[in-house]
Amino acid sequence: MALKMVKGSIDRMFDKNLQDLVRGIRNHKEDEAKYISQCIDEIKQELKQDNIAVKANAVCKLTYLQMLGYDISWAAFNIIEVMSASKFTFKRIGYLAASQCFHEGTDVIMLTTNQIRKDLSSPSQYDTGVALTGLSCFVTPDLARDLANDIMTLMSHTKPYIRKKAVLIMYKVFLKYPESLRPAFPRLKEKLEDPDPGVQSAAVNVICELARRNPKNYLSLAPLFFKLMTSSTNNWVLIKIIKLFGALTPLEPRLGKKLIEPLTNLIHSTSAMSLLYECVNTVIAVLISLSSGMPNHSASIQLCVQKLRILIEDSDQNLKYLGLLAMSKILRTHPKSVQAHKDLVLQCLDDKDESIRLRALDLLYGMVSKKNLMEIVKKLMTHVDKAEGTTYRDELLTKIIDICSQSNYQHITNFEWYISILVELTRLEGTRHGHLIAAQMLDVAIRVKAIRRFAVAQMSALLDSAHLVASSPQRSGICEVLYAAAWICGEFSEHLQEPQQTLEAMLRPKVTTLPGHIQAVYVQNVVKLYAAILQQKEQAADTSAAQEVTQLLVERLPQFVQSADLEVQERASCILQLVKHVQKLQAKDVPVAEEVSALFAGELNPVAPKAQKKVPVPEGLDLDAWINEPLSDSESEDEKPKAMFQDEEQRHTKPRAPEADEQELARRREARRQEQANNPFYIKSSPSPQKRYQDAPGVEHIPVVQIDLSVPLKVPGMPLSDQYVKLEEERRHRQRLEKDKRKKKKRERERRGTRRHSSLHTESDEDIAPAQRVDIVTEEMPENALPSDEDDKDPNDPYRALDIDLDKPLADSEKLPVQKHRNAETSKSPEKEDVPLVEKKSKKPKKKEKKHKEKEREKKKKEVEKGEDLDFWLSTTPPAATPALEELEVNTTVTVLKEGQEEPRGEEQDAEEDREQDLEKKPSKHKKKKHKKDKEERPKDKRKSKKKVPPADEEAAEPVENGTLEEEPLPPMSSYILLAENSYIKMTYDVQGSLQKDSQVTVSVVLENQSDSFLKSMELNVLDSLNARLARPEGSSVHDGVPVPFQLPPGISNEAQFVFTIQSIVMAQKLKGTLSFIAKNDEGSTHEKLDFKLHFTCTSYLVTTPCYSDAFAKLLESGDLSMSSIKVDGISMSFHNLLAKICFHHRFSVVERVDSCASMYSRSIQGHHVCLLVKKGEKSVSVDGKCSDPTLLSNLLEEMKETLATC
């Protein structure tokens, strides 16, 4: 054995370690892949050895190779083997490899559960730490579910190192297993007050990350975080807390008033720029939430703006960027405070950093007004000329358009100026936003009726110079403006001064070089112009001119018919045939202008955004159904694809015409020249497309004009925007003078001889009137448009599942799964619980001392709860108790738990068998009698008795507060009610709801065969109502029944469950139903049916939910519940049995019981809270109820009245 160990050690000396692998890779640069492939083969051999040290060394090398991009998933099992090594050095290598290559799709990851659990419970903090670190990288939903309880236990570890890691990994666990958030949250909340600053920082980090997506669930932590903010000196913790308050403030405006003073103090005192920025950010959020609710907030705004100016003027580019970012937030609510710093923002446009320039542009968007719009756009246009790089220039262009068009053009007072700006932007070279300029031209021309004449004139000039725009090297972008120009000139052709000149410009041969969609618009709008010209000529009785225009179209349209674009071909062909038909009519002197114009009658208005989405889907139309069923894979493979129209291969392979010789070419050229010379419409000076003639001989004599596009293009007839700026300034000056004159005359009439600073008049946006009357056309919507819904949230968002109410009491179903041995439950039997009671009898002298300690502890706990209560903390005085509920509130007590003792949980006990087991577990009668005797000996003063906390050896208070009653034996009870019965079958049913499904209940029907026949083919059908509907199998109609999934031999009973969907639960209802079945016996088979009425009571919709006294008291204090009460006389049943009957039949749990008074709680499947105060007199019982729905409460009390009447 010793020789074997020595041999193994010697072998390991010659194994390659990580350093050797790295050195070898560096030495094999030429054949690196081949060398690594050899190394992987060696590693595979090493992994087959039994020695764990060799395996760890191999996994270490694999980890390095994985970093180089090699797949090592094949070694996942070997990695788990190294993870399970006892030596920490090897274990660490295994966890490192797992954290790099394990993911949710790794097959063997399920094998790590027990190993990780073992390492988490290891006495070595380093084993536990490496397991937590590794798990955080490859945690899956299954691992999170199985290990959540173990990690939660580590949050209370004695070592801060482990506590910190456990707190941090809980965030990953919450994302993968959201159900663990509520059980773990109280312990996570405790870590906020951990003595170790590292653990405290970790807890702050986790809660702040959770609250970032769902802040409303963490409002209750505001007092605790406020305490941390005012006491902590850690800047990192302060930044996190202040960020959280920034998210919470919009949800609770009262919080802002609390925060404004400490945040202002921090802004004044801190030297850390990061903390200063977060404070300013949160103050902005506070002021936005308060809006006008805080009278003197202008000082805080000015303070923030001054501090942000310091950040923007700083040489650090990061601080400058953050300052601009925060300034944009202030701009939304307090624009005037930011507009004073316009000079600083404009300076940022000259910054070298493009991101800062872009952020300054975003800020300018909100700083514009009617008064300064022209000035800001003028400066931006200057920057457009100087801009380097197409990205920034495109962003400038976009921002100019956004600034001008925002809020439906509310800041533009002169639309002629805006049209001239758009035309100037068409001169930009290399822009990708030609379509954006075109969209604005179209939008302004359509919406603003007063500007159409001017817009048409500018677009006509643009079409005349279209050859300049179209021949630009980047014409694919900017030539989009020709699309808008052609459409505007065609649609509003009545405003054209020279429509024939524009028509000729649109029919030039150069147009055929434009993109297909632009040519299509040209062709369509040529006809509109043609219709307008025809009307003019016919009105002037100039038939020859009308015929000439028709001839022009007949000659020029064929060039579009031959276009490669199908849409252009189709439009041109249709229009050519139309024009030819018009030409025939003109030859007969038939007037056709009115008929042609009628083709384009009416106006085209803008369509509202998302109009298509708002069109209601017709009834019976299934948008997801196939129109034609797709072929199966086998069919599609067999069939060969066929050409849709003709065999393309044949078209391309047909024999071509023989090439012409030199003489033939010369003859054709001469014929073409003669044709061009005789054609009056041929523009001889227009250069032919270069690509058509560049290889043809004898074209050197044709003059070709080269255009230097580096020189800014000036289209003749287009006024510059600067001229409109001057005109606008003069117009506003005249307007001011007239207004001042009117004011002066008015003052002189009122007060002779007095002067009121007329020279100090300041112009506001409201004072500036637009240059022309603006009639903005509204957007059109489809008929019966549906209201617009917000876009659906991402269903894959991991934070969506964490939107959980953390203040709601924890239900039994929400407990974390804990692995137990099979006899774990039996070890906690009541018989064994009686043992400590016997010990306590011998410690009677200490009972008073224990009571005193518990009172002190209770008082401290109440003070802490008051400090942490959000409403109490935010209000100046604590809220007063409602007089009607004073007695109930006095009765509420707080169960004080010893350290390390788990909080008691209430259990739902609906079935009779569970209750019988509870009866068997109750203490002896002797103990009960002694307990009653002690009660009778107590003083009868209510206040004294209510303030007392029962000692630990008396079991009456604790079990009652948990919702179970342990006194005298209870009569047998069953929740199943008779539904229907005949000679064949007996039906009983019970209705159960679930808090997880707010619109569904499950009806459990027990079917008992009372005959000698064999019952089969059973089918249950219930007639649906408006409020309740039976859930049927997919594809079934409302008349189909639900088959019962079993058969009943004679004397056998079985249970079937049926799901019903319920709309409203506030009223009881009955549904008619039928059970049909076949009864088979020796004589044969018969079809039978049994009619029944299914009764859904309001109690059916309640779910037994435990509630503790502090939460119960808060619920009553809220003031959101409606109140009602009943009183029933002639009650002889004991109070204990009475409460048990209410709990069982009406699904309530006891919150607290004092003598013959008890508070009870239940909750409906739709979240209605139901609170009861049950008081027993000598022969009567009164029930006071509170509920969030008054109708539900009154119906519940009526049902309870029927139950109590039988007691």
Curated annotation (Swiss-Prot):
Organism placement in taxonomy: Eukaryota, Metazoa, Chordata, Craniata, Vertebrata
Positions of modified residues (N-acetylalanine): 2
Source organism superkingdom: Eukaryota
Record keywords, A-Z: Acetylation, Coiled coil, Cytoplasm, Golgi apparatus, Membrane, Phosphoprotein, Protein transport, Repeat, Transport
Protein's GO biological process: anterograde axonal transport; anterograde synaptic vesicle transport; Golgi to vacuole transport; neurotransmitter receptor transport, postsynaptic endosome to lysosome; protein targeting to vacuole; synaptic vesicle budding from endosome; synaptic vesicle membrane organization
Cellular compartments annotated: Cytoplasm; Golgi apparatus membrane
Native source species: Bos taurus
Residue spans of biased composition, Basic residues class: 741-759, 841-854, 923-933
Remarks, miscellaneous: Was originally thought to be a bovine leukemia virus receptor.
Subunit description: AP-3 associates with the BLOC-1 complex. Adaptor protein complex 3 (AP-3) is a heterotetramer composed of two large adaptins (delta-type subunit AP3D1 and beta-type subunit AP3B1 or AP3B2), a medium adaptin (mu-type subunit AP3M1 or AP3M2) and a small adaptin (sigma-type subunit APS1 or AP3S2). Interacts with SLC30A2. Interacts with CLN3 (via dileucine motif); this interaction facilitates lysosomal targeting.
Biased composition (Basic and acidic residues): 648-675, 731-740, 795-840, 855-869, 899-908
Family membership noted in the UniProt record: Belongs to the adaptor complexes large subunit family.
Record carries keyword Acyltransferase: no
Gene name of this polypeptide: AP3D1
Intervals holding HEAT repeats: 34-71, 142-179, 180-216, 218-254, 257-296, 298-336, 337-373, 375-409, 521-558
Spans traversing the lipid bilayer: none
SUPFAM superfamilies: ARM repeat
Modified residues (Phosphothreonine): 762
Protein name listed in UniProt: AP-3 complex subunit delta-1
Residue positions where Phosphoserine is found in the record: 632, 634, 636, 688, 758-759, 764, 788, 829
Gene3D superfamilies associated with the record: Leucine-rich Repeat Variant (1.25.10.10), Longin domain (3.30.450.50)
Pfam family, one: Adaptin_N
